[in-house]
Swiss-Prot record:
It comes from Drosophila sechellia. Pfam families: UQ_con (PF00179). This is Protein crossbronx. Belongs to the ubiquitin-conjugating enzyme family. FTS subfamily. It comes from the Eukaryota. The lineage of its organism: Eukaryota, Metazoa, Ecdysozoa, Arthropoda, Hexapoda.
Amino acid sequence: MTLDLDAHKKDDKLLITTIQQEYKILAEYKMIESEKLSGIYVIPSYANSLQWFGVFFGRQGLYAESVFRFTILLPDRFPDDKSLPTIIFQQDVIHPHVCPYTHSLDVSHAFPEWRCGEDHLWQLLKYLQVIFSDPLDSIRGIEVDKLKNREAAELLMNNKEEYVARVQENIKESKEHIFDTPPTEDPNYIVFEKFQQDVHGPVLDRIKAGRSKQTEPSAQQGNGGHATGLSWVKEGEFKPLSIE
């Protein structure tokens, strides 16, 4: 009997912890929405709130016109864990802060450790935006041997023409694969489709006319006024399903 009570208490504690974590992750998502970061789009996986899908659009500088997909992996105890979230690009991206082997972005120069309540995912994404906007400035004051891609750093500082050529190769590759079949069946994976007049034409016309389908009454009534896109959030409410 005692063992059963202990097991129930343990299950209840785990459920409470999960609910609290999901609220915190949802708050992070809402903060990102409110920041309106230009050229960066992210959304949590439909099945796992600790995995996020993202796309970075270069708007200026050496990486202008780039379209780089990436994944964010959150630590199991996020955001209470001091471990840093991991950003991994899905393709080769030449940059002093991106590992050429794992394609992971080194954020430790800006975030030595994760401080719960002080550090937020929107800041992490803002950092990504800044270092791609000015890669040379992003490595000032950092020893070359402490960078993830030493070769990229040396090219950037000593042979910018070659660095730019390598970047352009990355950009070309990213565009060639933008319409590829998704590597996952997760419905929240960000998918791009080629323009189809019969499908996208009416939407484009509404945008040009200053109207959006999302503002039409019928669209709002169909989903309660909100479309979260998150399976672990109750439809029509910002409430994790775990609470039920």
